[in-house]
Amino acid sequence: MKFNFNETEDAPDSRRSPTPKEPVRWVPLQSHPVFASLPSSQDEPAVSQLFPRNFMAWDGDSRVYYWDSRRYLLHRLSLRLGEPEPSSVLAAVPSKVMQPDLQVTFSVSKISINKSGSAVLLAGSDGICVMYLFGRASVIEDNVICRVVSIGSEIYTSSDSAITLLQASWHPDSDTHLGILSSDAVFRLFDLSSDTELPEQEYYLQPGEPGRSRTASSIYPADFSFGGDHLWDRFTVFILFTDGSIYILCPVVPFGSVYKWESVMEIYNDANMYGVKSSNSLAVSNSSLAIEWLEATFPDLTEQGTRGENILVVKAQPYALLDASLALQGPLYKASSGDGDEDFAVREAECKGRAVSLLYNLVSKDSILVTAWSAGQLQVDALVDEIQPVWISGNSSRLRMNSHNKIQGVAMICESNISELPVATSNLPLDHTVWLGHPPPLLRLAMVDLALPKMREGGSLVTLFADSLLPERIYSLHDGGIDSTVLHSLPFTSQASGKDEALKTPSVHTVLSTCQEESAVSPLLGFVPLSDSFGYSWIVAVLSSGECIVAEMKTWDLLLPIHVSTDKTVSSSAIEKKEQENSCIISKELLAGPKIRIAPHALPNQRSTPANSVEGRSILLDYVKLFHENYIEYAHKVHFELQHHAPNLKRIIDDQHQRLAEANEKISKVEKNQSFLEKRIDKAIERHDSLEQCLQRLRSLPGTHKKPLTRAELDFKSELDQYAGVEVDALQSSIETLRARVKKSTQKSHKGTVVAASQKKQYSKKNLIQDTQMSQLQSTLAKLSLMNSDNSKKVKIVESALKSQESSFM
């Protein structure tokens, strides 16, 4: 279902199709002039990058969008995938240029397109807006002027606000809903079809137990990801915090979004079957709340008998529980251990830096969560159990109603429910854990180290993408380039296919290396994966130097890991056997000759027979027949074999000559480079000697004889490094957010006092208060202020006298 919320009246220019002046021609995408016109990377200021940068987006069909950050223009490139060759990508020249009708006042770092391709999200750390690609538009100098709407300007782009955007994404089940996570630890869901300034849903995140926060990074969010099309996952938002902990918000449903009837009915029947009929009162309570929410959000569940069975999709209605709020489930613990502190220690030992990115990926029957760290590690986990909604009773939600008493907005505080639950372990049966409110445990699939170079203090910003054609493949976009990680085995998918194998190590390949050394800004401006219906896949990357890279990604047999044999004896013998088979031109039987003997062995007492006798002639005839039957036929076979193997022999000889020529050429190259190599070896030896001398001088310094740090000192040093690298940023952001809130509250209180004073003045006028009384009050206030200032001066004099006396006594 598509929602059209653009204005129906079209401008006169919008009826004209903005055709370019020059005819359309098709060129390879990497040779498109749009990328060649990019400014040089040397002109870009070396500013710290706080928001993941990606100026490219794909609508899933045949259009790629690119944002020009210098000219504030959006380019739309029409593509032909797989033409004229299956592995080629062509783009139309010239491209369609789209210009915002309003000036974008913030720096755009990321663009994203909704699933219908009707709107593009322009997001940055200081603001966010949406550009509508169709509807009311005009044409100026071949540029299509598109309508731009700011999102939450009072919250994100106001001059008084210190709130920064951390992540923004379209909801996968709605074309008009945006999810935004900000530095004030609030997740907001905006509905562009109703209101772009006020959020439709607000969730104030309160992770951990109140008053027992471990570090500042444990309460500072980093990223979020929507769930996929699987049971309650489709109603789930996964929140990542900078310490690596993952929390769950469920259920979160955009008002008016559409879902499949079968999907909603499946979780509805599950709640009725396993929750309500449980012997545990807590499971009955949780499942009853879930059933109540489902029946109110999707009224078709209760009206199924009256409306018939021909229901394909259902529409979500605005609803929220009045006396309960969503629980912030988590942090998700590892399935091998139920102790949260132990799991946190293990995670800190494996990963370094801070968590920067989160990706939810649904692969067949497995829900995969990939966490990226600033030091370059990827943490790949799978959900062991199904997600179920949890509410905390007593925390009422705040509703915003319209004139028809319908819900327009919901706001609630989401606290962690970990203190109310017993410690959950993975060895409990299903009947003891279902619908009890336990967050689903995580199964560690792999830890991948991308070995990123350390180029800046805060670490690298790693952005994760899933391949639309092969969900087992995950792309990692970072300062050093692009890497591809392929998962070869998944727990539930392998179990469903009948494979009972151990988890295999994922394969990691470098797709693109930017050879970064000391630059503070990544040269990658945009990245997008492409795919078509014939099974071909590509990646497109744009560099700040104006270079566009298009690479075809193999998909067939990619999930089969390469097996490398370590038995050198077998491999060498196989090679020798193959060489012997290739060198065999004539069969060994022909080389051995005929096996039949013509002349039999003569007995010692046998008489000789004369040749001219009858017996001698008969013996000679028999010898001639045997000779013809054996040697003549053998000669024919040899002749046939020689004729048959002549081309093969010629090919082998030519191959040997070619190899000989190549060997001679290599030998000549080596002879030419021998002097150069000798010079390099001499320089290396000299460098080695100088380094040894420097090492000897360093060893003689007094600081080298100091004792090494103890284990406790090393632990304390690592804590200080962690605090300097992660905690300071989180504390600084929290302080700025609190200052903004205090400033906003003081402004509101000042406005309230002004309004109250004006109301009081009007009321006094109505009661005919005389001006003399007002003047008396003013004079009294002036006297009081003078007395207050005099008293403060006297207090300062007394304090100075006391300090002087104390100093004299000491």
Swiss-Prot record:
Localization (cell): Nucleus envelope; Nucleus, Nuclear pore complex
Outcome of gene disruption: Lethal.
Coarse class of the protein's main subcellular location: nucleus
Coiled coil: 646-748
UniProt cross-references to InterPro entries, sorted A to Z: Nucleoporin_Nup88, NUP88/NUP82, WD40_repeat_dom_sf
Entry keyword set: Coiled coil, mRNA transport, Nuclear pore complex, Nucleus, Protein transport, Translocation, Transport
Name of one Pfam family that matches: Nup88
Entry annotated with the keyword Transmembrane: no
One Gene Ontology molecular-function label: structural constituent of nuclear pore
Region (Disordered): 1-23
Oxidoreductase keyword on record: no
GO-annotated biological processes: innate immune response; mRNA transport; protein export from nucleus; ribosomal large subunit export from nucleus; ribosomal small subunit export from nucleus; systemic acquired resistance
Entry's Gene Ontology cellular component terms: nuclear envelope; nuclear pore
Primary role: Involved in the regulation of exportin-mediated nuclear protein export. Required for resistance mediated by multiple R proteins and for the appropriate nuclear accumulation of SNC1 and of the downstream defense signaling components EDS1 and NPR1. Not involved in salt tolerance, ethylene and auxin responses, but required for systemic acquired resistance.
Quaternary structure and interacting proteins, as annotated: Part of the nuclear pore complex (NPC). The NPC has an eight-fold symmetrical structure comprising a central transport channel and two rings, the cytoplasmic and nuclear rings, to which eight filaments are attached. The cytoplasmic filaments have loose ends, while the nuclear filaments are joined in a distal ring, forming a nuclear basket. NPCs are highly dynamic in configuration and composition, and can be devided in 3 subcomplexes, the NUP62 subcomplex, the NUP107-160 subcomplex and the NUP93 subcomplex, containing approximately 30 different nucleoporin proteins.
Name used for this protein in its record: Nuclear pore complex protein NUP88
